[in-house]
Regions:
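Active-site rim elements
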Residues: 6-7, 166-170, 182
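Short, conserved clusters of charged catalytic residues that mark active-site
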Residues: 15, 176-180
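A basic- and aromatic-enriched beta-loop-alpha substructure that forms the phosphate/nucleotide-
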Residues: 16-24, 28-37, 43-96
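Short beta->alpha connector loops
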Residues: 34-39, 109-113
């Protein structure tokens, strides 16, 4: 993602989704179900049977609900309220987060064909061109990272997590994914 003119919106997940949708289209964005300033504002009756809650300003502040009838509201409140208190500017001196207001976003729950949640695809672009990508699998329990070049050759290095147990298949829509990454990088 190019930082020219966009630094202010990419630090907040809800704003980043809107910015990204303007560039590549809403059809490529996971639907937002709501955004709230606090956990107590969430109207759980309005949420579907499955959903995802996450804080808009950090990483790791995620609660996945696969079955609303068995949802642990107390644990979700505890986790998200803790994440809402996390301040990247004060804790890590990350200046772009200085004036970010922490919020909670609800998104549609999605999973891959294997029923194990979504694979996370990240493209690394240099000078506007995708040059490398990684696929994160098995999140959040047993996270695996696999890096690939743009010919989908597995790269022989790791970053904090082991490789997947078996070979990963090239996504059917890989070329479209690469083109969308290119658009975002310009």
């Amino acid at each position: 993602l190019s930082l020219v003119g966009s630094e202010m919106c990419i630090r907040d997940k809800a704003e980043a989704k809107e910015y990204t949708a303007e560039i590549i289209g809403h059809e490529h964005i996971i639907p937002t179900l709501g955004v709230w300033d606090s956990f107590d504002e969430i109207d759980f009756d309005s949420l579907p049977f499955q959903f995802v809650l996450k804080t808009t300003h950090d990483s790791g502040g995620v609660v996945i609900c696969r079955d609303k009838s068995n949802f642990d509201l107390t644990a979700a409140r505890r986790k998200l309220n803790k994440s809402l208190r996390h301040n990247f500017f004060l804790d890590h001196r990350e200046y772009p987060y200085k004036n970010v207001k922490p919020r909670i976003i609800a998104e549609q729950y999605m999973e891959d064909e294997d029923g194990k949640g979504l694979k996370d695809y990240k493209f690394f672009c240099f000078n506007g061109e995708p040059r490398m990508m990684f696929i994160a699998t098995n999140r959040p329990v047993d996270t695996r990272f696999d890096f690939f070049d743009m010919d989908f050759n597995h790269l022989p290095f790791a970053q904090g997590h082991p490789w997947a147990d078996g070979p990963l298949s090239k996504p059917v829509n890989f070329e479209q994914m690469r083109e969308l990454a290119r658009k975002l990088a310009l």
